[in-house]
């Protein structure tokens, strides 16, 4: 295996293959941990009669510097926060998508929207940045999925957030909608 990037480290092919296998195993462990936490959060919500928000976004949206502490704002309103990757595997997406579902993140997002649509105490807030080209397709599709279940779609464009005042109003409106629907 001739990889010039690693030449100075003198790794053998066997060492590189072993490292890749260990990395894949750890990645699977990480994904399983996320799913376990999602199930624990849902159980906690049910046990304590709480409502929750699935905060769906790209991995970099979990960075507090990027998301401006939206997760903290939501929990401060008495709601639980879950991520789309913590619940997407529980979905049985039967909704007919009008887009080609070829990207892992998009597939996870559609599955999460479908799962949220079937839950009475969950809503989904989609975080988006920079008007990302391929992500633009997801906003319409996620909205359609949620609306097919009578749920309100909330999109927060992270790069347009200067302060959390407007976000707070949107989340409170979503919470009021949840209570009204109950």
State the predicted function of each range.
Residues 1-182:
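An N-terminal assembly and electron-transfer interface module characteristic of large anaerobic redox
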């Amino acid at each position: 295996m001739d990889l010039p990037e690693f030449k100075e480290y003198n790794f053998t092919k066997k060492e590189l293959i072993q490292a890749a296998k260990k990395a894949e195993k750890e990645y699977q462990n990480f994904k399983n941990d996320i799913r376990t936490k999602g199930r624990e959060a849902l159980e906690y919500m049910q046990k304590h009669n709480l409502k929750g928000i699935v905060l769906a976004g790209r991995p970099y949206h979990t960075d507090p510097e990027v998301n401006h502490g939206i997760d903290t704002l939501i929990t401060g309103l008495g709601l639980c926060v879950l991520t789309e990757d913590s619940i997407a595997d529980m979905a049985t997406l039967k909704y007919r998508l009008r887009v080609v579902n070829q990207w892992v993140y998009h597939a996870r997002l559609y599955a999460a929207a479908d799962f949220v649509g079937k839950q009475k105490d969950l809503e989904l807030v989609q975080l988006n940045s920079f008007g990302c080209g391929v992500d633009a397709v997801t906003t319409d599709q996620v909205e359609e999925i949620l609306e097919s279940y009578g749920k309100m779609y909330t999109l927060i464009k992270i790069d347009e957030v200067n302060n959390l005042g407007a976000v707070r109003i949107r989340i409170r409106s979503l919470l009021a909608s949840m209570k009204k629907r109950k």
